[in-house]
């Protein structure tokens, strides 16, 4: 069976909600990430067999978002494309699907990633098609309906963050401390240039021909325990989840070039990493935030690894309650989200899985480390995980 390798990886900066990347639709951001990943791989465009791109909030994005991104990146019209919606796991699931296709012999070289523009999510007015009756009517936010509200219990994902914190006995201070560390690590990474190699700058056209360049993640900022302690609970009275210790609404994209080892050799493309194992896990929807524990355990078993043998973990910080997963698995703090996570950097939901993988690859290389695992929880009670080994 062929090995699967990653030969190119890039991401856009993560834009703040209604921030610098807001003028660009998700497929535009996806095209930029795809183009950069391909350029870094050195692989000719006509050698790509297929494209998978994650995208969650698709209302108003237009037909076939992945196809839009691929053609926007300059890929030939002969390349088939698939849009993946597995909520926050979409970007990583795209890479997992690419790996499976290659192992099955259905393709030899695939672009996979994710993209999201939460700034451009529309509002939904139900009932207009058939005519509204007398009385008040609700306009719904597509970010909430399609991305951030539990389809089963009807509660915001933040209530799942509350539930996870309760299950893991995490106090408000525990979560605020976790958030402060995330901000500190993200700011340190920015200042040291740790993100520079993985990010492709984005030129955003504006009025009267003015072009604005976005070159770094927009949401990391200075904060403190005292500052976070002043914030009110965001999702329930007396709760522990706040705007300061939760992830943000964001825009961004990430892409990777995935190939069989044989195809990479044929194309003289230098692998960044080998894909070792992948796994998924599902449990009660309201405990989605804790699902990465199960997914990571499955990947460890399939890879024949232990927690102690893994150099770096990138686990999505949808909420600071993800600290419960770190504690449950016994992951050392110094190996966990070493450059900060979504609490500080942001969470463009369809892109985050690919973004975490890109960040993991560059972090392994910068530190001279080999083994890494990336994992994300996702709405509905699931999680995805992937193990890689740097080459």
Residue positions per predicted region:
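Condensing-enzyme catalytic core mediating Claisen C-C bond formation in acyl metabolism
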Residues: 1-26, 36, 225-290, 294-302, ...
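Active-site-proximal alpha-helical scaffold in enzymes
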Residues: 86-116, 165-194, 255-262, 326, ...
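Active-site pocket-lining segment
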Residues: 160-162, 198, 206, 276-344
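N-terminal extracellular/periplasmic Venus flytrap/periplasmic-binding protein-like
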Residues: 10-12, 23-24, 29-32, 174-266, ...
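Flexible glycine-/small-residue-enriched beta->alpha junction loops
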Residues: 109-163, 167
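Conserved catalytic cysteine-centered active-site region
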Residues: 55-109, 151-159, 222-248, 327-355, ...
């Amino acid at each position: 069976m062929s090995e699967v390798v990653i030969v190119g990886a890039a991401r856009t900066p993560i834009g703040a909600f209604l921030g610098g990347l807001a003028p660009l639709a998700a497929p535009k951001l996806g095209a930029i990430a795809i183009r950069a990943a391909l350029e870094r791989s050195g692989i000719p465009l006509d050698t790509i067999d297929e494209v998978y791109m994650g995208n969650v909030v698709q209302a108003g994005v237009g037909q076939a978002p992945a196809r839009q991104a691929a053609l926007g990146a300059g890929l030939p019209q002969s390349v088939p494309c698939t849009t993946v919606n597995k909520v926050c796991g979409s970007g990583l699931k795209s890479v997992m699907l690419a790996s499976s296709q290659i192992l099955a012999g259905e393709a030899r070289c695939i672009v996979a990633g994710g993209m999201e523009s939460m700034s451009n999510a529309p509002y939904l007015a139900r009932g207009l098609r058939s005519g509204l009756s007398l009385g008040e009517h609700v306009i719904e936010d597509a970010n909430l309906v399609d991305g951030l509200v539990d389809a089963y219990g009807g509660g915001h994902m933040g209530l799942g963050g509350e539930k996870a914190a309760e299950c893991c006995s995490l106090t408000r201070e525990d979560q605020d401390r976790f958030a402060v560390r995330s901000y500190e690590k993200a700011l340190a990474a920015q200042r040291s240039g740790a993100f520079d190699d993985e990010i492709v700058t984005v030129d955003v056209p504006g009025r009267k021909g003015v072009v604005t360049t976005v070159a770094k993640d927009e949401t990391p900022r200075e904060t403190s325990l005292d500052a976070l302690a002043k914030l009110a609970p965001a999702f329930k009275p007396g709760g522990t989840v706040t705007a300061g210790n939760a992830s943000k609404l964001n825009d961004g994209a990430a892409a990777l070039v995935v190939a069989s080892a044989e195809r990479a050799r044929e194309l003289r493309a230098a692998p960044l990493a080998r894909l070792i194992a992948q796994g998924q896990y599902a449990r009660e929807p309201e405990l989605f935030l804790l699902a990465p524990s199960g997914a990571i355990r499955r990947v460890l078993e399939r890879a024949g690894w232990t927690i102690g043998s893994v150099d770096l973990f990138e686990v999505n910080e949808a909420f600071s309650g993800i600290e419960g997963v770190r504690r449950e698995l016994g992951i050392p703090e110094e190996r966990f989200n070493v450059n900060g996570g979504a609490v500080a950097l942001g969470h463009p939901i369809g892109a985050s899985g690919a973004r975490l993988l890109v960040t993991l690859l560059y972090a392994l290389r910068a530190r001279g480390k080999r083994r890494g695992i990336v994992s994300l929880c996702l709405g509905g009670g699931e999680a995805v995980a992937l193990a890689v080994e740097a080459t």
